[in-house]
């Protein structure tokens, strides 16, 4: 048997990406410029949205969405307890109060009945999270928001454009996902995407903010606000300032520095060309995994349903009957067999930062149950079918072995 060493999620970079980056390096313009603008345009085409703003991370995108909406002190923003910290930390960055909701049984989505109960007169935004690229139930989300419309009081220009709680999707994993045929980005009111090195589509670091078409939104004005907030509050970006005689500018708010560079965008332009084939290969791998685990104690999340076609960013599984300790032993045994794996994620109330904010894991039992026996397997386009088969057989064997030993002891 071959000696395997299977990484969790390496980037898929070809000579085409390298050539495009080299072209940018030779061009004399490497920060935000024409290639960033071109990537924004093409991403808007891909997601069927009016505008896209490329930034240096999805976290920056999520925070800037809240800042454009002028969410701040005295406001509440609702997030699921089962997510990565970035979904929630941005709420504290703007001075608002995070409100966590437990998830449904056997899935990562918020319990929509609990969500409805969590809404108050202070609720300004709900942040659903598309874990692994699996899109949430937006029909239900918008029903909840409409039902609670009378509680909402707008306190800013863009809040008035909605006149209800705004749904801001954390779609870090979901570029290429669809809900009832609609692409992620065009479903929620606002959406943030991640282009981090481990994502399906990468610019090394990076992310974007976008919004769905809305007659109450002036898209050019909205885009300009994002641009200003992403570059110190400056009224001109670097490319505009460098035009002959165009040095004059103003700072209209003491803002941030989170713009994307043309070096990063160069990667993205080629990745977007390749993206259909990258998604197809991920689908083939997930289908192979699903067939291999059918009838076993390994239960993966479903990436395709009647309403959802996932981007298949993560292959999240649960090991039936495994305790937290057994789950951790299985991960160690997989590592010994040359298979990298991961856990997505520690629920937020388990983390020190959120304990210090007063959150208690005991209040979110289903989030803990989801975490307790969860293992994420390698899912990337460099995996061979042979490696996938090895992972399947090893994972099943190791899981049975660990659970059998636990019963004996």
Regions found by a protein language model. Name each.
Residues 155-202, 224, 247-251, 299-300:
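Conserved active-site segment immediately N-terminal to the catalytic lysine
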Residues 67-171, 178:
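PLP-dependent aminotransferase-like
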């Amino acid at each position: 048997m071959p000696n395997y060493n299977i990484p969790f999620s390496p980037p898929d970079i070809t000579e085409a990406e390298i050539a495009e980056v080299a072209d940018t390096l030779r061009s004399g313009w490497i920060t935000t410029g024409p290639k960033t603008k071109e990537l924004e345009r093409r991403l808007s085409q891909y997601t069927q949205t009016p505008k896209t703003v490329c930034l240096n991370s999805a976290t920056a995108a999520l925070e800037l969405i809240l800042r454009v909406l002028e969410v701040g002190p005295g406001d509440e923003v609702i997030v699921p307890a089962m997510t990565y910290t970035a979904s929630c930390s941005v709420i504290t960055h703007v001075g608002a109060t995070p409100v966590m909701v437990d998830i449904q049984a056997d899935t990562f989505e918020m319990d929509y009945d609990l969500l409805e109960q969590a809404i108050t007169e202070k609720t300004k935004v709900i942040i659903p999270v598309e874990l692994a690229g699996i899109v949430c139930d937006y029909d239900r989300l918008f029903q909840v928001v409409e039902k609670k419309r009378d509680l909402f009081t707008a306190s800013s220009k863009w809040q008035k454009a909605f006149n209800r709680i705004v749904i801001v999707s954390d779609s870090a994993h979901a570029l290429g996902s669809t809900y009832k045929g609609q692409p992620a980005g065009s479903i929620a009111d606002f959406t943030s995407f991640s282009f981090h090195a481990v994502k399906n589509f990468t610019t090394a670091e990076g992310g974007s903010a976008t919004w769905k078409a809305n007659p109450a939104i002036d898209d050019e004005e909205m885009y300009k606000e994002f641009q200003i907030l992403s570059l110190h509050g400056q009224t001109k970006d670097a490319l505009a300032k460098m035009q002959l005689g165009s040095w004059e500018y103003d700072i209209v708010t003491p803002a941030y520095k989170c713009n994307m560079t043309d070096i990063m965008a160069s990667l993205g332009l080629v990745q977007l060309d390749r993206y259909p084939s990258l998604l197809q290969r991920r689908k083939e791998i997930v289908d192979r995994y699903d067939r291999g685990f059918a009838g076993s104690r390994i239960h993966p999340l479903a990436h395709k349903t009647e309403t959802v076609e996932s981007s298949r960013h993560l292959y999240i599984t649960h090991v039936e009957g495994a305790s937290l300790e057994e789950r951790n032993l299985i991960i160690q045994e997989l590592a010994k067999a040359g298979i990298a794996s991961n856990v997505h994620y520690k629920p937020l109330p388990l983390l020190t930062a959120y304990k210090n904010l007063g959150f208690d894991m005991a209040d979110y039992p289903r989030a803990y149950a989801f975490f307790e026996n969860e293992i994420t397997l390698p899912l990337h386009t460099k995996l061979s079918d042979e490696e996938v088969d090895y992972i399947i057989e090893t994972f099943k064997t190791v899981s049975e072995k660990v659970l059998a030993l636990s019963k004996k002891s």
